[in-house]
Amino acid sequence: MVKLRLKRCGRK
């Protein structure tokens, strides 16, 4: 999902 991708990018 896009929401999961955005959260993973922000945590990196």
Curated annotation (Swiss-Prot):
What is an example of a GO molecular function annotated in this UniProt entry?
structural constituent of ribosome
Localization annotation: Plastid, Chloroplast
> Could you confirm whether the keyword Ribonucleoprotein appears in this record?
yes
Q: Which PROSITE patterns match?
A: RIBOSOMAL_S16
Write down any Gene Ontology CC term: ribosome
InterPro entries linked to this entry: Ribosomal_bS16_CS (IPR020592)
GO biological process entries = translation
Write the record's keywords in alphabetical order, separated by commas.
Chloroplast, Plastid, Ribonucleoprotein, Ribosomal protein
Family in the record? Belongs to the bacterial ribosomal protein bS16 family.
Name listed for the protein in its UniProt record? Small ribosomal subunit protein bS16c
The source organism is Ginkgo biloba (Ginkgo)
Specify the taxonomic lineage.
Eukaryota, Viridiplantae, Streptophyta, Embryophyta, Tracheophyta
